[in-house]
Amino acid sequence: MAHPSLFIDALQYNNWSEEIFKQINQGGLSAVHVTICYHEDFQEMVQNVIDWNRRFEDYSNLIFLGRTAADVRKAQKEGRTAIFFGYQNCSPIEDNIGLVEVCHQLGARFMQLTYNNQSLLGTGCYEENDPGIKIGRAHV
């Protein structure tokens, strides 16, 4: 059933299950930004996408992969929830700036450039020194 108001969970990590998907659906969430990567490399992130693709098949009546803002309205209209992939770290791009586009093609819509530690894209809050960026300008 469609909900009259638009609700979006801007960041979520969970032990995903049918029960959780039912709860977010019953709560009227039209979209959820789901963390699928913390410190995983590219191959590990791809496995997470594979796992999510299985969930999209198994629970297609409740969730689907969101890629655009229009998918949020689609989810609201259909009474489902659009799942948007996000990364808490840029580790899946490893040292290959071309993987940014590949990650986007796989569904990533959010990528935190830095958090705690130094990455190729910037310096994290735990670093004592700021050595500068390596490929950050090209990424941005």
Residue ranges and their predicted role:
Residues 138-140:
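Conserved small/polar residues in nucleotide/adenosyl-binding loops
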